Curated annotation (Swiss-Prot):
GO terms under biological process: biotin biosynthetic process
Keyword Transport: no
Residues reported to bind pyridoxal 5'-phosphate: 108-109, 180, 205-208, 236-239
Family membership: Belongs to the class-II pyridoxal-phosphate-dependent aminotransferase family. BioF subfamily.
Protein name: 8-amino-7-oxononanoate synthase
Record's subunit section: Homodimer.
Domain of life: Bacteria
Cofactor requirements of the protein: pyridoxal 5'-phosphate
Gene3D superfamilies (alphabetical): Aspartate Aminotransferase, domain 1, Type I PLP-dependent aspartate aminotransferase-like (Major domain)
PANTHER family: CLASS II AMINOTRANSFERASE/8-AMINO-7-OXONONANOATE SYNTHASE, LD36009P
Job description of the protein: Catalyzes the decarboxylative condensation of pimeloyl-[acyl-carrier protein] and L-alanine to produce 8-amino-7-oxononanoate (AON), [acyl-carrier protein], and carbon dioxide.
Catalytically driven reaction(s): 6-carboxyhexanoyl-[ACP] + L-alanine + H(+) = (8S)-8-amino-7-oxononanoate + holo-[ACP] + CO2
Classification via Pfam families: Aminotran_1_2
């Protein structure tokens, strides 16, 4: 049988450069601490912002759903895979996001792909922030629309593109709400102002803002008091919500169209009952326990202040994403490995996830972290950084 020698060669190069990674196997519930390699470590790499992955109400809802409805649905949504709970979840999401309707996909990644590839044609143009998530980039690649990229959060450049693109049928501005690698928030008020001035649509990917920003975690649109002025809101059910999946919220016309045209929706089996019911319960928890979001922000502010005090260069974050900039990729991964060995799970992030020379340790703070855990992590981070001459 023919071998994949060309792939093996590339893997060997990655190993020589110190950028080859192995998957970390966790053997516990996802929480502020996890079991990794039979060792308890402080978790600083999870997107479990509010600690909902192991919330008793979500776990109870999932268990009861399995007992009543089974392990799976056995079909796609458009044939025999739509249960009452799927429709109920989508109505809850629409109400939560203050839109007319919503549609759930298998992941946030496929949501962006499904939306972008469905609603744009060769007569249209999509205008994207240069630091948008990979799922947006891949979704744009699936369209036949023209593409323009503006410099990160550069509103002058965005306006120039809008002025030069008046002849297109549809112009769609796409942006992350919170940028996942740097933790900064999109200037959405200005984006919406420009969109309204130049008759363009706006799409926001709120993966890292849902459950984090806005009233009860409603996201970036609500954070900027722009409810009703953003055409497409994409979110995940796998980060702050704590379960699995993605969704799009918007007008009834948009959602009805996507039900007929979005290929990831049309050709994927629907969410199993346990996942669906847990997602439903998570929305209720967001409404019932706003103190979780308050604690999240308190912990994030505390950790950020301490990290800067240690002397780290921190990306211009405005959220619980705290990127400690290292630069060199191999050094970043050595640092990450040293931290894990000392009991701090803080994953190194490097090219192609971020630009070359922009490698970093990305810490994500959660509502579950105690001050004692954060202080312990900070002590270990400082000690290992000094050993590697990252800090003086």
């Amino acid at each position: 049988m023919k071998e994949f020698t060309y792939l093996q060669d590339e893997l060997e190069t990655m190993k020589q450069q110190g950028t080859h990674q192995t998957l970390k196997e966790i053997d516990s519930k996802q929480s502020s601490t996890v079991t990794l390699n039979e060792q308890s470590v402080i978790q600083l790499s999870s997107n479990n912002y509010l600690g909902l992955t192991s919330h008793p109400r979500l776990m109870k809802a999932a268990k009861e759903a399995i007992d009543e409805f089974g392990a799976g649905t056995g079909s796609v949504r458009t044939i025999a895979g739509t249960m009452t709970m799927h429709e109920r979840l989508e109505k809850k999401l629409a109400a939560f996001k203050k839109t007319e309707a919503a549609l759930v996909f298998q992941s946030g990644f496929t949501t962006n792909q499904g939306v972008l590839s469905s609603i744009l044609t060769k007569d249209d143009i999509v205008i994207s922030d240069e630091l948008n998530h990979a799922s947006i980039i891949d979704g744009i690649r699936l369209t036949k629309a023209d593409k323009k990229v503006y410099g990160h959060a550069n509103m002058e450049e965005l306006e120039k593109i809008l002025k030069k693109s008046m002849n297109y049928r549809v112009r769609l501005i796409v942006t992350d709400g919170v940028f996942s690698m740097d933790g900064d928030i999109a200037p959405l008020s200005e984006i919406v102002r420009l969109a309204e001035a130049y008759d363009a649509f706006v799409m926001v990917d709120d993966a890292h803002a849902s459950g984090v920003l806005g009233e009860n975690g409603r996201g970036t649109v609500n954070h900027f008091k722009l409810d009703g002025r953003v055409h497409i809101q994409v979110g995940t059910l796998s980060k702050a919500v704590g379960v699995l999946g993605g969704y799009v919220a918007g007008s009834a016309v948009l959602i009805d169209y996507l039900k007929h045209k979005a290929r990831p929706f049309l050709f994927s089996t629907s969410h199993p009952p346990a996942v669906t019911r847990a997602c439903e319960e998570a929305i209720e928890v967001l409404l019932d326990e706003p103190e979780r979001i308050e604690t999240l922000w308190e912990n994030a502010a505390y950790f950020k202040e301490k990290v800067i005090g240690l002397g780290f260069e921190v990306a211009p974050t405005e959220t619980p994403i705290i990127p400690m900039m290292i630069g060199d990729e191999a050094l970043t991964f050595r640092f990450s490995k040293a931290l894990i060995e000392r009991g701090v799970f803080a994953q190194g992030i490097a090219f192609p996830t971020v630009a070359k020379g922009k490698a970093r340790i990305r810490a994500i703070i959660t509502a579950e972290h105690t001050k004692e855990e954060l202080d312990r992590a900070l002590t270990i981070i400082e000690e290992e950084a000094k050993k590697l001459n990252i800090l003086d």
